[in-house]
Design a protein with these regions (language model features):
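Juxtamembrane/disordered regions of integral membrane proteins
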Residues: 1-157
């Protein structure tokens, strides 16, 4: 019988997800600084906590912390999926697809519940695409790290 957390998969998922969250954060911040997008990761992360992210250093720090927490949560979910459901074959592709699944959930089904600003969701192709690509990168990075942390492995007991 497979059991989750036999080999520390929970905490490894937390670590992988938080680190991959930093990768996603960096990607979205770069796009925002370059003027490709209007909204940065703080806008999406803080949308879960409050209706609108206020300007300032405090909001930036809180947004970064929220990104780590959200990344850690999804990292545990992805770790669980790879431990119980998916095989190790093509783990990067599967991680990418799981990231796209997160995008569909967060910005399709739960966008209103998370309080994302309408102008973010209607901000044009660049905005929506950058969020999609950011979460695809997040999923791939999480899978990559889970492989390095030996959560994703060829044989299961």
């Amino acid at each position: 019988v497979l059991a989750f957390d036999d080999r520390g998969e929970f905490l490894k998922g937390v670590y992988a997800g938080a680190i991959a969250g930093m990768v996603r954060y960096s990607f979205r911040e770069i796009l925002q600084v370059l003027g490709v997008t209007q909204f940065d990761t703080n806008s999406t992360s803080l949308g879960v906590l409050m209706n609108q992210a206020p300007p300032g250093l405090g909001a930036t720090v809180l947004g970064f912390i929220a990104t780590l927490i959200i990344g850690a949560f999804w990292g545990v979910v992805i770790s669980f999926v790879f431990t119980i459901v998916l095989s190790h074959e093509q783990y990067l592709l599967k991680g990418t697809l799981l990231g796209i699944g997160i995008w569909l959930f967060e910005f399709g089904f739960a966008a209103e519940a998370f309080g994302y600003p309408p102008e973010m969701l209607n901000g044009g192709l660049a905005e929506v695409t950058s969020i999609l690509v950011g979460l695809a990168i997040y999923g791939a990075a999480t899978a990559f790290l889970l492989k390095r942390f030996e959560v994703i492995r060829p044989s299961r007991p």
